[in-house]
């Protein structure tokens, strides 16, 4: 095997390992948030998550030494993006108060369908019939999980879908900002906006935890989320997004296991069937995205010859 090919293979495998680590952090974060919801307001949990994530870089290093950390060419878009992420987190954590982990994450995985549908009007990346079909099938999976009109339907499922929509809009604005602002700058604004926005509200809903474990988990939420995002960024520096994206779906396995171990939750047949449809449709979307990008890259090479 040529040295360059060997180096690329090692980089990709390392990137995949980092991606799996990031996904594990996000699964642990959702589990921790659901557990903390038993002892305090969702607003307090979300505030702890963003405040901890903002302070975490100061513990492991001095972020102010990084030149241009706060410099952004699009401050309004940074604010919009940060508010979208905050709204997504609030809706997700609120849904976790009522839904099982596996149900909530299955609905959150509808995010790629929202992204694909919104990329046309917002980014000019129009979706063709194959991907529209995958989107439609994916939402059938969402309906299987939520079962609207059935006895098993819980209104909190709408919170999970709202979280997915907000996260899709957040992802699209992130792609726009990536053209001008660094990852570190974008992370900085996400965390500080979330922490400051909830600060005036938190005193009115504050509950002082008496259990040392609850205090430790409350402090840890920010570190877990922040570390997960750093692993995610590191993974994308080592391997292409098309290689890494399918591993996002390992989170549903992790949260199902954690839901059973921590809360004794057993997924029902509707959640399992719906999750399988959602994951299958999402993987097909990734396959089509990879194929379309490959065709574009090939055409670009030919035109440059």
For each feature predicted by the language model, list its residue ranges.
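Transmembrane alpha-helical segments that form core, pore/gating elements
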Residues: 34, 42, 57, 150-210, ...
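Hydrophobic/small/kink-forming positions within alpha-helical transmembrane segments
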Residues: 23-31, 58, 82-90, 112-117, ...
């Amino acid at each position: 095997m040529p040295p360059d090919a060997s180096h690329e293979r090692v980089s990709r495998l390392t990137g995949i390992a980092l991606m799996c680590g990031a996904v594990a952090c996000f699964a642990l974060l959702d589990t921790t948030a659901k557990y903390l919801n038993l002892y305090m307001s969702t607003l307090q949990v979300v505030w702890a998550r963003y405040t901890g994530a903002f302070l975490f870089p100061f513990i492991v290093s001095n972020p102010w030494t990084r030149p241009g950390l706060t410099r952004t060419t699009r401050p309004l878009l940074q604010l919009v993006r940060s508010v979208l992420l905050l709204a997504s987190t609030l809706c997700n954590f609120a849904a976790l108060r009522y839904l099982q982990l596996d149900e909530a994450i299955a609905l959150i995985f509808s995010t790629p369908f929202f992204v694909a549908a919104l990329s046309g009007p917002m980014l000019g990346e129009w979706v063709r019939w194959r991907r529209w079909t995958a989107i439609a099938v994916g939402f059938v999976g969402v309906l299987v999980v939520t079962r609207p009109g059935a006895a098993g339907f819980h209104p909190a499922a709408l919170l999970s879908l709202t979280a997915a929509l907000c996260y899709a809009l957040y992802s699209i604005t992130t792609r726009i900002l990536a053209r001008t602002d660094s990852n570190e700058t974008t992370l900085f604004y996400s965390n500080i906006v979330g922490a400051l926005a909830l600060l005036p509200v938190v005193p009115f809903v504050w509950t002082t935890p008496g259990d040392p474990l609850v205090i430790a988990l409350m402090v840890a939420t920010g570190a877990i989320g922040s570390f997960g995002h750093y692993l995610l960024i590191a993974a994308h520096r080592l391997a292409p997004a098309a290689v890494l994206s399918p591993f996002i779906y390992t989170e549903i396995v992790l949260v199902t296991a954690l839901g059973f171990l921590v809360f004794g939750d057993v997924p029902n047949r509707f959640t399992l069937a719906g999750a399988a449809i959602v994951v299958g449709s999402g993987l097909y979307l990734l396959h089509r995205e990879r194929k379309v990008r490959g065709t574009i890259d090939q055409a670009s090479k030919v035109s440059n010859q």
